[in-house]
Amino acid sequence: MDPVAGLVLGLCCLLLLSLWKQNSGRGKLPPGPTPFPIIGNILQIDVKDISKSLTKFSERYGPVFTVYLGMKPTVVLHGYKAVKEALVDLGEEFAGRGHFPIAEKVNKGLGIVFTNANTWKEMRRFSLMTLRNFGMGKRSIEDRVQEEARCLVEELRKTNALPCDPTFILGCAPCNVICSVILHNRFDYKDEEFLKLMERLNENIRILSSPWLQVYNNFPALLDYFPGIHKTLLKNADYTKNFIMEKVKEHQKLLDVNNPRDFIDCFLIKMEKENNLEFTLGSLVIAVFDLFGAGTETTSTTLRYSLLLLLKHPEVAARVQEEIERVIGRHRSPCMQDRSHMPYTDAVIHEIQRFIDLLPTNLPHAVTRDVKFRNYFIPKGTDIITSLTSVLHDEKAFPNPKVFDPGHFLDESGNFKKSDYFMPFSAGKRMCVGEGLARMELFLFLTSILQNFKLQSLVEPKDLDITAVVNGFVSVPPSYQLCFIPI
C-alpha cells in the first residue's frame, strides 16, 4: 500500500474511533462542550489559564460537566458543593489518582502522589506515620523549622538591604526542612550540590505550569517523539532521582535498625523487616522524590507570592508587624503557640493562600468504581478535575474574591474565622500529606522575616503586578526584586 494512502486510512480510522467513543458514552456522562475528533476540546481551552476556561464552561453547563482532553473524557467538578460532595462525602469513590502522563513517566507507578489502589494506601499510611513519629505538627519538626527560619533570616541579612530576587533564598528554606526530615541533614545555602538540586526543582515547577506541558499531558504518545521542554523536565527528574539514590546508598552503609535518624532509615528498616513488594529501593527513591517536590516548591512559591502581596499592601505588612511586636517581641523566635494569639497574622496567611490559588485545578482524581453522581453515570477510571479556584474564589464565602482582603478570615470582633471553603491543600482522602508541615513553615518563616525586616519595594506599590505569569498546574508569581531592611 502507498505510504500516503496508509497514513490517510490510519487517520480516518482514528477519526471514526474517536467519534464512536465520544458518542457511545455521551448520554451517560454529564453534558459539556462538543469535542472535536481526536483532539477533543483542547482548542476551546486556554492552556495558559485552564481554570478560567473551566469557569466559562460551568456558566453554560453547570457545576458538573464533561470535557474531552484528547480522546479521553474528563469530568469537571466546579463549585464548593460539587467538590465537597465528591472528595469528602464520596471520598472512597473519588480517591483514585487521575492520569498525569509526564509524572507517570517519571514515577513509573511508584511513590506517594501518583499511585493508586494498595500501593498508594501503603505508601501514604507509612509516610504519614513516619512523619508524625518524627513530629510533623509537633515539637521536633517545629524545632527544625525554627532553626531553618533563623538560618533564613541570617541569609537575608547578607543581602545588606540591597535589591535582590528572593526566589532562590525562599526555595532553600523549605527544601532544607525536607532534607532535615528525610536525610537527617541540612545544607549550607552556598553548597554546590544543594544549588544544583534547587535549580532543577525550581525549573521543573515552571515547566509543569507551562502551556506546552498542558498540551503534552493530553497527547504524550505523539509528543514523546518531538523535542520540547518535557525532555528538560525528565532530565531534571533523573538528576534528582540520582541524587536521592546516592543518599540512600550512604544511609544503607550507616543504618542502625535500633536508631532510625530520618525517613530513609525508617523505610530501609521496613524493607529489612518485612517482605513487602510495595517497599523497594525504587519505591523509596520515588517516595522521597515526591516529598521533595510536594514539600519544597509549593511552599517556596507560596512564600514568594506572600512577600509580593505584602509589598503590594504595605498597610497589611505593617499591621502584621505590630501584632508580632505585641505578641512575640524582638528577643525570641516565633513558635506555633503564638499563632492562636495572632488572629490577624493567621488571617493574612490564609488569605494569601486563598488569593493566590496555588493549584487551580488540583491534581487529577479518578473514580475507583462506577459512580452515579447527581444523576450522571461516571464509569470506573474516569479522570476527575476539581476546580479549587471555584471554591477559593467563591463569591458567597468570600465577598470580592478577586480582592486581597484578610478580612475574609476575620469576624466582626477581629477574631480568626475558619471557612469550610478554604481548600488550598485539596480535601478528602487525597489531601496533601504535608499539610501540617506546610502550615507550620508558612507561619514561622513569614513571622521570622517580618520580625526582623521591613520589606521595601523598588517601585510604588500601586505599580506592582501581582498577576500570575502562568496559571497552569501551579500559579507562578511574576519575578520581582525587593530590599530586606533590618529593623
Curated annotation (Swiss-Prot):
Transmembrane segment boundaries: none
Any one Gene Ontology cellular component term annotated for this protein: endoplasmic reticulum membrane
Record-level GO BP terms: organic acid metabolic process; xenobiotic metabolic process
Assigned EC number: 1.14.14.1
SUPFAM superfamilies cross-referenced by the UniProt entry: Cytochrome P450 (SSF48264)
Cofactor: heme
Catalytic activity: an organic molecule + reduced [NADPH--hemoprotein reductase] + O2 = an alcohol + oxidized [NADPH--hemoprotein reductase] + H2O + H(+)
Enzyme kind, highest EC tier: oxidoreductase
Induction: P450 can be induced to high levels in liver and other tissues by various foreign compounds, including drugs, pesticides, and carcinogens.
Compartment annotation: Endoplasmic reticulum membrane; Microsome membrane
Keywords annotated in UniProt: Endoplasmic reticulum, Heme, Iron, Membrane, Metal-binding, Microsome, Monooxygenase, Oxidoreductase
Keyword Heme listed: yes
Major location (coarse): endoplasmic reticulum
GO MF entry, a single one: heme binding
UniProt xrefs under InterPro entries: Cyt_P450, Cyt_P450_CS, Cyt_P450_E_grp-I, Cyt_P450_sf, Cytochrome_P450_fam2
A Pfam family matched in the record: p450
Record's keyword annotation contains Transmembrane: no
Binding site for heme: C432
Protein's job: Cytochromes P450 are a group of heme-thiolate monooxygenases. In liver microsomes, this enzyme is involved in an NADPH-dependent electron transport pathway. It oxidizes a variety of structurally unrelated compounds, including steroids, fatty acids, and xenobiotics.
Family: Belongs to the cytochrome P450 family.
Note in the entry: This protein differs from other forms of cytochrome P450 in that it catalyzes the 21-hydroxylation of progesterone, resulting in the formation of deoxycorticosterone.
Protein name, UniProt field: Cytochrome P450 2C4
Organism whose genome encodes this protein: Oryctolagus cuniculus
